[in-house]
From Swiss-Prot:
This is Integrin alpha-10. The chain crosses the membrane at residues 1123-1145. It comes from Homo sapiens (Human). Glycans are attached at residues 98, 234, 336, 364, 733, 763, 839, 921, 1011, 1018, 1039. Residues 1146-1167 are cytoplasmic. Widely expressed with highest expression in muscle and heart. Found in articular cartilage. Heterodimer of an alpha and a beta subunit. Alpha-10 associates with beta-1.
Amino acid sequence: MELPFVTHLFLPLVFLTGLCSPFNLDEHHPRLFPGPPEAEFGYSVLQHVGGGQRWMLVGAPWDGPSGDRRGDVYRCPVGGAHNAPCAKGHLGDYQLGNSSHPAVNMHLGMSLLETDGDGGFMACAPLWSRACGSSVFSSGICARVDASFQPQGSLAPTAQRCPTYMDVVIVLDGSNSIYPWSEVQTFLRRLVGKLFIDPEQIQVGLVQYGESPVHEWSLGDFRTKEEVVRAAKNLSRREGRETKTAQAIMVACTEGFSQSHGGRPEAARLLVVVTDGESHDGEELPAALKACEAGRVTRYGIAVLGHYLRRQRDPSSFLREIRTIASDPDERFFFNVTDEAALTDIVDALGDRIFGLEGSHAENESSFGLEMSQIGFSTHRLKDGILFGMVGAYDWGGSVLWLEGGHRLFPPRMALEDEFPPALQNHAAYLGYSVSSMLLRGGRRLFLSGAPRFRHRGKVIAFQLKKDGAVRVAQSLQGEQIGSYFGSELCPLDTDRDGTTDVLLVAAPMFLGPQNKETGRVYVYLVGQQSLLTLQGTLQPEPPQDARFGFAMGALPDLNQDGFADVAVGAPLEDGHQGALYLYHGTQSGVRPHPAQRIAAASMPHALSYFGRSVDGRLDLDGDDLVDVAVGAQGAAILLSSRPIVHLTPSLEVTPQAISVVQRDCRRRGQEAVCLTAALCFQVTSRTPGRWDHQFYMRFTASLDEWTAGARAAFDGSGQRLSPRRLRLSVGNVTCEQLHFHVLDTSDYLRPVALTVTFALDNTTKPGPVLNEGSPTSIQKLVPFSKDCGPDNECVTDLVLQVNMDIRGSRKAPFVVRGGRRKVLVSTTLENRKENAYNTSLSLIFSRNLHLASLTPQRESPIKVECAAPSAHARLCSVGHPVFQTGAKVTFLLEFEFSCSSLLSQVFVKLTASSDSLERNGTLQDNTAQTSAYIQYEPHLLFSSESTLHRYEVHPYGTLPVGPGPEFKTTLRVQNLGCYVVSGLIISALLPAVAHGGNYFLSLSQVITNNASCIVQNLTEPPGPPVHPEELQHTNRLNGSNTQCQVVRCHLGQLAKGTEVSVGLLRLVHNEFFRRAKFKSLTVVSTFELGTEEGSVLQLTEASRWSESLLEVVQTRPILISLWILIGSVLGGLLLLALLVFCLWKLGFFAHKKIPEEEKREEKLEQ
């Protein structure tokens, strides 16, 4: 077998950088513009070019003192010095709208919008409010600002005149009949006190008349309620003998409401006539009333009957005149009181009826629905106007408004009831929280608006708004999680920049991720023709943390010059509210799911909070023709500059192309080595346009066998790693560098030497270009080893292997392994008869009953044989590594020892020689050699028997003992005195038991075993007839030849070295048999044989196979004794006993000894 080598082979491997590594937004050199954090400076940002300068506009909607957060917009110069501060625009100080009062807490700057190509912009204050009666309505307003940063009007498309926008002229009878005048003054003061007097609400004028009318004060004379009350208090009666009411009404309707007297053309006109008598010019009354009708004047008539009642006159004619003066119906516009004092009683009723009137408006039906619309909360520029979100319209259900050329268009309240059911109108869906639009193929445009609180999950609708206010919803998108604020931010994206929308991004910044973290999520929808919006996937921060990812989003031009637009997503709560900005690259089919860059505020040189709360990236602000990105933070605005993108094409060429295994051409560190030179080259290209320095520096470092233990190669004058070097590159050119290295160790020629170069652009001194995403950051060259194999560079070898074992054994005549021999020798010879054999190896496999003790070369040889043990019964040996050269021959001796634990019937040794060189099939048969022999083992066993009864005497009848004879035990013992683990042994016991006629003389009563299994077989039949008891006197032995024997066969368990096993046989002697028999002495012979199972690898010696147990039985005769001898013996015994008793008596043995108390008692009795 050969591993193919080609001398000119190169194997370059390129390693790419990760997707989340920093890309071409320069986060290390940001442009920071600080501002007041308490003003929420950074809430909104807008890139702006106007007046020949580049600015970054920053909204500070909470700017101003506490209680008057008017808000403002700061302009931060970008083209000038880096430390130039931001200038406050003071836009909040201007009078916005037609209000005469300065707005407070309007929060100007919450949204900023670039206007069409005039260098101006629009700043919105959604909380701009105006008072209407006792209510305050936040309709919102947007200020138009020109290129010189001066307000040029405002937009308040939902701001409407208050219902109390009225001009009220009081025509007061001051003739002599009015009495008392103080009651009239009180009536005037109380009536004025109920009116909301303000230049934007109610103005009051007064005409007093008697004989002639007089303008006491005109409509525009007083601006506050206090001024009018003061004038009413100081009003004097004109007096007069006549009451010319018609003339006064004519003057009031023709002069009092005129602009010269402070009248407002758009205000509602109310005339209040107070008189106590019928007019003296009644014939002129129809003309006066006609003039009032022409001037759209609504008339209240108040008849004071005090003069008539005091003189007891009929007031009918007077009341008819006053009813004629009052507008219809009389129930609403006519009053009569009994006297002057009673005027104060109708003040409340009159005030209520006045406030029941509304101003004159063209769109009266929607005035109250848009009062809290908060225009400017969200804005979107269209080609033909501006799209506003009206988040507070329709009781906070929300809506949108399209302003086109001064014409406003918005859907009526019920136009969206299919999407936003009226039953849920109190849930505050906040439609208009975000607005945008998308352009489909074919030129069709759809408006987009988010309602993040709809059903608490959020909703986005794509719709068309027609000229008549009708709405056609093309598709709606629903949020998936309660409280996620789905739809709070919308970002349509034209990825391929063909003018049509390809992707819609919908943010849910409060989406709860794992571990209840407020991670946020952005949903990516593909825009299609068949299915309008199809969910492609989601974007979210990793790992999960509190982020509010998607709080701000901004479409970006093609930052990475790949032809597709990109998008930025803010996450202001990341890293403990420091914030982060994510950059995603667009593709032909959408948006890449992983961020190309994450810019964390924590990694910036300035401490920031809530970085990423707003973002805008459309223009080049620093003048390098590259798009920059503006990002808002708490109290700061940051400008991130784009950096040029270059693409590096590295190459690495090595000379010579391969490393010689045998030849060395130089000396390094005092050793022979192979020297090589590598040419490292870089070709630089770039698609980045603009004015930037096309020359830059790069740092690189090189290493040899970086991940390999042990140094095979090193750089000249250095080690395995080369110190970092700096190289100057230029776009459009190829720059090269020479690297010199050498190889000392060629033994591991299979693995090429790996030369690895890693590189990166050097931007330590100034911001420079970045590498394209497709550019490598390292290159590796694998330099192979070459072989000395002739002109064809192909080594053809012929390995010949011969083996010889010093034992022989066949199946019929196996070799017996006896105790004196424990080893077997195998002589091995390996020879190479052709070309070099590289990486020659010898595989050795041997049977489990062998242990390799040693491998010894037979003669001194320069060829090394080194072996490793992949397993207990295999070896893998390298021979002459790395090259087993032509004609080489090596002989060595393998010494094996027989295993004591594994006993097999055969030993074998198999050897196989191989190399990486090529060997023809015709010579492969001698690459393998095997030798084997059949064997048996002679174990060292000791087989013995011992008995507890060796001789037994049989007593005749009439003597003791009587009954059966004794029970005795014969113990058989097998001891393993060798090293082998022996198994499969069998003990066969032949126990003589039965004589002629089935008479038992011995019988087996019990078998006691330990580590053995025994069975008792049938009685054996002797070669001849069993011996008869009467004939025992003619034989002296009982054995298996003349008796029937009991046979016990025991299979012994495994017997380890130094252990033993025993079998106990309990037998009973039958006295009855031997008492009847005629004999003097005989021997019972029990025979025991130790054998092996069939097919066993054991071979037992004769000495260890047999054992005997002998029992000698002897019959005794009775001895007769004379009767006189017995009688004499008894009498002699009795005489001897009497003599013994007499002697003891004489010695006092039988005398009773008294105790001391008894002696004393006897002495006393005697006395």
